[in-house]
Amino acid sequence: MGFVKVVKNKAYFKRYQVKFRRRREGKTDYYARKRLVIQDKNKYNTPKYRMIVRVTNRDIICQIAYARIEGDMIVCAAYAHELPKYGVKVGLTNYAAAYCTGLLLARRLLNRFGMDKIYEGQVEVTGDEYNVESIDGQPGAFTCYLDAGLARTTTGNKVFGALKGAVDGGLSIPHSTKRFPGYDSESKEFSAEVHRKHIMGQNVADYMRYLIEEDEDAYKKQFSQYIKNNVTPDMMEEMYKKAHAAIRENPVYEKKPKKEVKKKRWNRPKMSLAQKKDRVAQKKASFLRAQERAAES
């Protein structure tokens, strides 16, 4: 069929239907959302859980949510800006931080449901494929599905780092190794060692060593926060190992105490009747004194 010019007449505007608001804003892929949200009809009121991962300029957000008519309900959430509490003070948006955030989310969720002792996940980080299976006589493994949003799901994306962290933390999420760093599309082989290096931040450490040798100024500029916090390339692996152990030890979110705000009043408060009468009496007395002084002089 050839090119057909759209005639924008009265009928066109009368029948025009706008897309959903979040589609117009470019925030939601409804084609993907429909498939992530719709539950099997024979499961009735059982929620279909999604693991939502969003990467911003300075943070990584991981949430477990399910859909309702009123809107999505968040069951549990973890953020990369919580990682300094566990010893990771720098590089809060890299692949290793994404893994830590996913691990924190999984441990926090299982702790909330009292399943953290049943499903320990993969304690030793190998980078290899691992799947959580339900244990007989115990509650089934918590199953959810990855919601990557509008992120381009290329091999090595940080979204899959968070996924791997959640799976190693004890959540059952369907996945394959094809999108993890270390997968070679030509040979169709997956290198767990390469993936482990990314989880432990060794790719960043190698680049730091390269910059120290090649361009000292570029190193000082790009890794200023690492220098400020005394983080060297040789410390990286140990830092992440300690962080993983600390997350498993205490994944619970601690609420910050509310600050008591003293309200400032910018206008004068209204006077009571007694104050008003007193003010009038003072003005009268002042006026009479002034009159007396004038008469004496």
UniProtKB/Swiss-Prot annotation:
Cellular-component GO terms for this entry: cytoplasm; cytosolic large ribosomal subunit; nucleolus
Subcellular location per the Swiss-Prot or TrEMBL entry: Cytoplasm; Nucleus, Nucleolus
Record PTM Phosphothreonine, positions in chain: T232
Main localization category: cytoplasm
InterPro entries per UniProt: Rbsml_uL18_euk, Ribosomal_uL18_C_euk
Skewed-composition ranges (Basic residues): 258-268
Region: Disordered, residue numbers: 252-297
Positions carrying Phosphoserine: S185, S272
Cross-link position per record: Glycyl lysine isopeptide (Lys-Gly) (interchain with G-Cter in SUMO2): K220
N-acetylglycine PTM positions: G2
Sorted UniProt keywords: Acetylation, Cytoplasm, Isopeptide bond, Nucleus, Phosphoprotein, Ribonucleoprotein, Ribosomal protein, RNA-binding, rRNA-binding, Ubl conjugation
Molecular function terms from GO: 5S rRNA binding; structural constituent of ribosome
Cross-link (Glycyl lysine isopeptide (Lys-Gly) (interchain with G-Cter in SUMO1)): K220
GO process annotations (BP): ribosomal large subunit assembly; translation
Modified positions (N6-acetyllysine) in chain numbering: K5, K48, K220
Subunit composition and interactions: Component of the large ribosomal subunit (LSU). Part of the 5S RNP complex, which is a LSU subcomplex composed of the 5S RNA, RPL5 and RPL11. Component of a hexameric 5S RNP precursor complex, composed of 5S RNA, RRS1, RPF2/BXDC1, RPL5, RPL11 and HEATR3; this complex acts as a precursor for ribosome assembly. Interacts with NVL in an ATP-dependent manner. Interacts with RRP1B. Interacts with IPO5, IPO7 and KPNB1; these interactions may be involved in RPL5 nuclear import for the assembly of ribosomal subunits.
Function: Component of the ribosome, a large ribonucleoprotein complex responsible for the synthesis of proteins in the cell. The small ribosomal subunit (SSU) binds messenger RNAs (mRNAs) and translates the encoded message by selecting cognate aminoacyl-transfer RNA (tRNA) molecules. The large subunit (LSU) contains the ribosomal catalytic site termed the peptidyl transferase center (PTC), which catalyzes the formation of peptide bonds, thereby polymerizing the amino acids delivered by tRNAs into a polypeptide chain.
HAMAP family, alphabetized: Ribosomal_uL18_A (MF_01337_A)
Similarity comment text for this entry: Belongs to the universal ribosomal protein uL18 family.
Protein name listed in UniProt: Large ribosomal subunit protein uL18
Organism of derivation: Bos taurus
